UniProtKB/Swiss-Prot annotation:
This is Inner tegument protein. Pfam families: Herpes_U30 (PF04523). Keywords: Host cytoplasm, Host Golgi apparatus, Host nucleus, Virion, Virion tegument. Residues 604-1082 are annotated as: Interaction with large tegument protein. The keyword Iron-sulfur does not apply. One of its GO terms (biological process) is virion assembly.
């Protein structure tokens, strides 16, 4: 195929969508001919096509074989995955026979379909919100097809591919593949290794190093493909130990010869086996108890064991550092550190995080925390939790709980509340029980230690959603802010002289975070709470300080735990850390653009803690005894793995003198390079080797060959890049013809390895790959003294895939949860509004003889209820109205959050100024802007109508408050708070006051509409047994005064037919005595 850069424009794209009958299935399958559209653009087109009922084309035959598999010779141990396309049919469909098969297939899922349709229907019918096609876009979750998982080469395939090609350049290309992609361990046998070595041409490139240090080379370039990495490594050792040692050529790498490498590798295997056995020790053997040799201190067997293992791992890492960059060894070390991290988490116990001054509630919360997240080491808490509750005699549990509220913050400790009432640490809420929930307001701080506030997620939620703090509680919040500041200063803040943390210090940090209630799971919960929180201009400064400090601590802890979960002192983690930081930065900044300053502090701290690198002294010991060429190869190899220059290394590039290169003109050399670029042969670049010493060769080769190839590569979509072989060809050409450009080679190799190994694209990977592509462009500019800009299609396709995944992972779940909650809330509020409107249409009459209320509409009697029940209903309506005023604020918060997400997406995308000229990206931005506009319109319409509901409800609530005030004027609380005389005076004034009202005229047919709401309202207020009183019946009721009985208490009821009772006591003493005693007899 001719590499013509003019043939890079996207071809016409056709869309195939399912017909109307297929929309009932959960998954919407779509096909696209010639994969040139970005994911987001494609989603939008697919949605519009479906909604406009575009005819369906016949399903096309999928492509079964990826060319990359044939080119690379992937290991046979990797299973090939094919995608089966469902067959769609349409009577009106037509399709040409010559259409190419689809290159990439997308499967779009509609998990939120029903929820969102209900929401749209609700908005359209109730609030007259126009239903928009574009807003459906957010509810399509694109499931990216994993194109190529992490794969390794098969040595047998490499050997077979070299049968017909024995030139040094072909062998160099083969070694380049091995060093770039690594060999699968199960394909490396001693016979194949020997056969490969025998094919290498002596005194060419780095072939002598491979022949002389074969054990090191293959250990350095082999990946452990088995899940049991230790077993895979042991089998690899058995094969490598059978390779005969070759004679020395005069200079020798003392630490990398076959015998030395085998000896160290065997020691590594034995050490790892021993350490893994120790890390498998049951926690029971590590239970804290006084050490036999030091009974007078707080030292325990448990902590002695932990320190012993840490020391052994540190010693292991130091002793075997010279092989700690061989891929097979690196994977073993990485696996060991993962095991250590998991083990350390599961030796944490309740006793480790208990403070001496913990309150009763503190201890209960910490028991629940430890048992929930680290159950294997805290089984003993099941009995301790029950005993703690049974033995408490000084704490009144009533003070901990809220029996009437239903705010969302209460739900964060719902299961914990059930555990307390059931005295069972394993209890789970299945919706079968009703019980009071742990308080989340600031009053709970009377029973909760300041340093333990993060164990109470509901309280954190409550504080974040307040605009002001009561004056009497400001001191409590100040203490919390001081505690947060101390945590930031002592645990988080980067010191001026930043040094990498030792393994012991990293584990200590895990311990300190857990002591204040933070681990991976709780950090995620707090990030979710923070992402749904939006401060307003009228928020009190003390709350803003709380929010900023909390965000700093939670996000730092979150990134720390992610890094710690992946940590090992290897190049694997070094490269992984870059990706982690970019991923988390993208998530944080897209949530809140104003977090950019905060992110700088977080990333600096993480970089300081996890500063893994290579030293020059290590390199000198690593290459001890080696010659210049050997050191050069090893330096390049380390650079390609780490991707960074930790220390300079100067070397000379030896080239063969060839007079041919100097006897041709620059114009002739230009034509030769152009001919090579246009050649159909993938190995055509090898013919340029004789000309590589020409003074103009580097510049001409880069301009005529490299730049067009890079332009072609960056003009592909990411899916096409994965099946295109030209990037690999370019790497081989540069490795052969530009050997001194190791930075350029590294970035190209990284881009290639990323393209074939990645199985998930997110915003972090986009940032990293964008950086790599522009570094390639920068090196080209330096080499050619020109200004070259790569094409944008590749980066845009990756960016839009990343945003698709972001929408799927973060936005869609949030929208699903929020719309479901808002929809339920609005439905409940509408029912409440209808009840209020129905009561406004009624007239109530009281019968003073029996204290019953008769509720009528016009002449129709609706409900008869007792006065006490009526007043209770009035109080309940007022309480519900006040709760709705608070809970309806969540709709405003969700509007601010969603519009903020969309705005941040646009801002983030627009910040990539180099890509803004791309048409697909512009369509994406326009789509998100339209969605944002529709969201604003929808929420505005909802807000207007909710305000109308509130205005209507306010009329009734004001009337009910007046009725309640009249009833409460002589209540016991009112008398206690003032005096009996003042209450009687106020009651007298109310009795003679004139309260006029207007009766609404109600149509006769309206009675049938209002009656069900009124009946349901008063039926729900019939007296029932109080579950709370039952649960709290064990507590003795104490009082410091004799309470006044409420005015409408049963004992204040008027005596009926009093004339019948006159002179009842004028009887013989014996008869009167009998009348009094008889009711008391059983």
């Amino acid at each position: 195929m001719t590499h013509d850069n003019r043939q890079l424009l996207p071809q016409e794209t056709k869309l195939v969508t399912p017909n109307k009958d297929t929309l009932s299935s959960r998954y919407l399958h779509v096909l696209i001919i010639d994969n040139t559209l970005s994911t987001i653009e494609f989603v939008y087109m697919a949605v519009k096509a479906v909604l406009t009922q575009v005819d369906t084309l016949n399903a096309l035959e999928q492509r079964k074989n990826r060319p990359t598999n044939r080119i690379l010779g992937l290991s046979t141990s990797v299973s090939k995955r094919y995608i089966n396309i469902p067959k769609f049919s349409s009577s009106g469909a037509s399709n040409s026979q010559g259409v190419k098969t689809l290159a990439a297939i997308r499967k779009f899922c509609l998990p939120d379909k029903n929820c969102f349709r209900n929401f749209l229907s609700f908005s359209t019918t109730l609030f007259k919100v126009p239903s928009s096609i574009d807003i459906y876009f957010l509810f399509f979750t694109a499931s990216t097809v994993s194109t190529m998982a992490a794969r390794a080469l098969d040595l047998e395939f490499i050997l077979s591919s070299l049968k017909n090609s024995t030139s040094p350049e072909s062998l160099l290309a083969a070694t380049a593949k091995i060093e770039l992609l690594s060999l699968a361990a199960d394909s490396v046998t001693h016979n194949r290794v020997i056969a490969f070595i025998n094919r290498l041409t002596p005194k060419k490139y780095h072939f002598d190093l491979i022949r002389q240090y074969a054990v090191f080379y293959f250990l350095n370039s082999t990946t452990l493909t088995s899940e049991n990495k230790l077993l895979s490594a042991e089998l690899l050792y058995e094969e490598l130990s059978q390779i005969p040692s070759s004679s020395s050529s005069g200079t020798e790498l003392e630490n990398l010869n076959n015998a030395e490498v085998l000896y160290v590798f065997d020691r590594i295997l034995n050490s790892i086996k021993m350490l893994k056995n120790e890390l498998s020790s049951p926690i029971g053997k590590l239970r804290a108890q006084p050490a036999a040799n030091d009974p007078g201190t707080d030292k325990t067997i448990k902590y002695s064991k932990i320190q012993s293992i840490i020391q052994k791992i540190n010693s292991f890492t130091h002793e075997n550092s010279l092989l700690a960059n061989c891929r097979a060894v690196v994977e073993l070390i990485d696996d060991l550190y993962r095991k250590l991290y998991s083990w350390f988490l599961h030796v944490l116990t309740f006793e480790d995080i208990q403070f001496p001054g913990d309150t009763f509630l503190d201890r209960l919360l910490k028991m629940d925390y430890c048992f929930t997240y680290y159950p294997s080491s805290n089984r003993h808490l099941i009995d301790l939790f029950e005993k703690t509750l049974d033995n408490q005699t000084f704490t009144n549990l009533d003070k901990f709980f809220d029996t009437s509220g239903n705010s969302p913050e209460l739900l964060y400790q719902k299961t914990f509340s059930l555990k307390i009432f059931s005295k069972n640490l394993t209890a789970q809420d299945n919706g079968l029980y009703i019980y009071p929930l742990l308080k989340t307001d600031l009053s709970i701080l009377d029973f909760l230690g300041t340093e333990n506030i993060l164990f109470h997620r509901g309280l954190i939620y409550h504080i974040l959603h307040q605009k002001t703090i009561p004056q009497e509680r400001e001191n409590d919040l100040n203490k919390i802010n001081q505690f947060f500041a101390t945590v930031i200063q002592q645990v988080i803040e980067t010191k001026s002289s930043c040094l990498p943390a030792s393994l012991s210090q990293l584990l200590d940090t895990i311990f300190h975070f857990n002591r204040i209630g933070l681990n991976m799971e709780t950090c995620r919960t707090y990030i979710e709470i923070l992402s749904n929180h939006m401060a307003t201009p009228d928020t009190q400064p003390i709350i803003n300080t709380f929010t900023i400090n909390l965000t700093h601590i939670v996000f730092t802890a979150h990134v720390f735990f992610i890094c710690m979960e992946n940590f090992s002192p290897t190049f694997i983690f070094y490269n992984r850390k870059k990706l982690i930081l970019e991923q988390q930065r993208a998530i944080l900044i897209i949530e809140r653009n104003d977090y950019s300053t905060l992110w700088k502090q977080i990333s600096d701290h993480i970089e300081c803690l996890f500063n893994v690198s290579l030293s020059e002294s290590f390199f000198k010991e690593y290459t001890k005894g080696g010659n210049e060429d050997q050191k050069q190869f090893l330096y390049k190899n380390l650079f390609e793995k780490w991707g960074n220059v930790f220390f300079p290394f100067t070397y000379s590039v030896s080239t063969s003198n060839n007079s041919t290169a100097h006897h041709i003109t620059t114009l002739e050399l230009r034509d030769i390079c152009k001919e090579v670029y246009q050649s159909d042969s993938p190995d055509a670049y090898e013919s340029l080797l004789p000309y590589s010493t020409h003074p103009s060769f580097k510049t001409l080769f880069v301009k005529i060959y490299v730049i067009p190839m890079v332009s072609h590569i960056t003009n592909l979509t990411f899916d096409k890049l994965q099946s295109d072989c030209r990037l690999l060809t370019l790497i081989h050409a540069c490795k052969l013809l530009l050997p001194s450009q190791h930075l350029l080679l590294h970035y190209m190799a990284w881009l290639y390895a990323f393209s074939i190994n990645v199985d998930h694209i997110d915003l972090g990977t986009f940032t990293v790959i964008k950086s790599v592509i522009f570094k390639i462009a920068d090196h080209i500019n330096v080499m050619t003294h020109t200004i070259y800009s790569p094409e944008t299609n590749l980066l845009v396709s990756i960016l839009l895939n990343a945003y698709t995944n972001y929408l799927q992972k973060y936005v869609n779940p949030w929208i699903k949860q929020t719309i479901t909650a808002n929809f339920s809330l609005i439905q409940t509020y509408i029912t409440f509004t209808k009840q209020c409107a129905s009561i406004l249409a009624t007239k109530c009459n009281i019968n003073l003889d029996n204290l019953f209320i008769y509720i009528t509409i016009g002449t129709d009697k609706i409900v008869t209820t007792s006065f006490c029940s009526f007043i209770a209903t009035c109080r309940n309506l007022v309480r519900q109205h006040e709760e709705f005023e608070k809970s309806l604020q969540t709709i405003q918060i969700s509007e601010i959050t969603l519009t903020g997400m969309l705005r941040n997406i646009i801002t983030s995308v627009s910040s990539s100024k180099e890509l803004l000229t791309n048409e697909a990206l512009q369509k994406f931005i326009d789509t998100v802007q339209r969605i944002s506009q529709h969201v604003n319109e929808t929420y505005h319409s909802i807000s207007v109508n909710l305000e109308k509901c509130k205005t209507s409800n306010d009329i009734l609530i004001e009337s009910l408050k007046k009725i309640i005030y009249i009833v409460d004027v002589l209540s016991s609380n009112a008398i206690l708070n003032t005096s009996l005389a003042s209450r009687c005076l106020e009651a007298a004034n109310l009795a003679v006051s004139n309260n006029s009202f207007t009766i609404l005229e109600i149509k006769k047919d309206a009675v049938a509409v209002f009656k069900p709401f009124i009946t349901q309202l008063f039926e729900s207020m019939k007296p029932t047994t109080s579950l709370h009183k039952k649960l709290m019946s064990t507590q003795k009721l104490t009082t410091d005064h004799i309470p006044f009985l409420d005015t409408f208490d049963d004992r204040y009821n008027l005596v009926r037919h009093v004339e019948r009772q006159l002179n009842w006591y004028a009887a013989h003493a014996e008869a009167a005595q009998q009348d009094l005693i008889t009711p008391l007899k059983f």
